[in-house]
Amino acid sequence: MACRSGCCCNSIGSFNEDNARFLMLALLIIIYLLCGAAVFSALEQPKEKLAKERWAQRIEQFTNKYNLSQDDLKNFLRNYEEANVAGIRVDATRARWDFAGAFYFVGTVVSTIGFGMTTPVTIAGKIFLIFYGLIGCAATILFFNLFLERVITVIAFVLKFCHERRESRKAGPTQNCRRPSTDNRDRRTDSLAGWKPSVYCVMLILGVAAILVSCCASAMYSAAEGWDYLDALYFCFVAFSTIGFGDMVSNQREIYEAQVAYRVGNFLFILTGVCCIYSLFNVISIVIKQVLNWLLRRLETPCHCPGRGNRHPRRNAVVPGHMRSRRENSIETDAVNDSEADGRRMSGEMISMKDFLAANKVNLAIMQKQLSEMANGHPRQSGSSSRHNEFSGGVGALGIMNNRLAETSVDR
């Protein structure tokens, strides 16, 4: 096929990089869902069939023993199902809608766990839940993001401190006694100042923290609820990851030993566990994004069509290596423009929302940070922050972790 309009290559380079990454992730998620469905179907379907057969046998035996029709028995069982939805159990349970029970319910709402053991049944309650959840879930997500920002900052500070101690020990006593040259001292200072922890170290630390919290919480639930330890560990993951099936729910019995202490421990463990797992999920998402970037680089094919080299690639496009110098020049120009804009803002001009929304990937966390810096009189640095990599302009938690880890740094 002849080249039309200068190029006819159907390579990955003609796509926007973010769109290519999004489509590849969507495809991988679909494949992941299909594989998961196959595994769970193979594991759980035989058990489901066996349970249905046993239930049919029990109904038949019960109707024959007490001379009842199956229709009457099924109607009675439907009434029990309705009572079960309302929170009524054969064994006595705690009140669902007293203040303590309602507090537990709203906690599962705003944290998006949603166990399902308690649901509003009145029209007024359902309408109120819509507006209450809209604000509460948004505020809780913001809380999780702020927690993530702080825990990443603390971990990065500790790891950097350990790295500096290790580097100072490597220098040795002989080098410490000698007066180092100015160039070597400046070079070493710049190297330490630009060091950032690896995402894998952060992921390992968060993983260990999540495991410790889950194991301690499982021990408490196993003792208080009478669950097997493995079932308690399963409940912790379902609750902390906000999956919230509702097949196992803590703090539902009417009476517990040391009831006040158990309720406080239950609240603290769920709060801490959700924060840890949320942070761990977001760090794992960086690793997944790295894999996607690696796959995109593997799929890059250079374009040899005549006249293609005269075109300027779009920003964020996956382009061959010999064309990236032009994109770097464009980025430097953007840095100068950003610097001029910062100068105008610092000179007392009003902050224009158009300046923030000019970029097509401004998220809430970055916008809040920029507004705070402008209000406090601290302009954002335009030299390095204007540079782009695969993680620049991330949304939500990715935006918070941008340039905080080695893998998300613009200097890597």
Swiss-Prot record:
It is found in: Cell membrane. One of its GO terms (cellular component) is plasma membrane. It comes from the Eukaryota. Residues 242-247 are annotated as: Selectivity filter 2. Keywords: Cell membrane, Ion channel, Ion transport, Membrane, Metal-binding, Potassium, Potassium channel, Potassium transport, Transmembrane, Transmembrane helix, Transport, Voltage-gated channel. K(+) 1 binds at T112, I113, T242, I243. Signal peptide: none annotated. One of its GO terms (molecular function) is protein heterodimerization activity. GO terms for biological process: potassium ion transmembrane transport; regulation of excitatory synapse pruning; regulation of NLRP3 inflammasome complex assembly; regulation of resting membrane potential. It is a multi-pass membrane protein. Its main location: membrane. Residues 374-386 have a biased composition (Polar residues). Residues 1-21, 148-198, 289-412 are cytoplasmic. Residues 374-395 are annotated as: Disordered. Homodimer. Heterodimer. Belongs to the two pore domain potassium channel (TC 1.A.1.8) family. K(+) channel that conducts outward rectifying tonic currents potentiated by purinergic signals. Homo- and heterodimerizes to form functional channels with distinct regulatory and gating properties. Contributes most of K(+) currents at the plasma membrane of resting microglia. Maintains a depolarized membrane potential required for proper ramified microglia morphology and phagocytosis, selectively mediating microglial pruning of presynaptic compartments at hippocampal excitatory synapses. This is Potassium channel, subfamily K, member 13. The lineage of its organism: Eukaryota, Metazoa, Chordata, Craniata, Vertebrata.
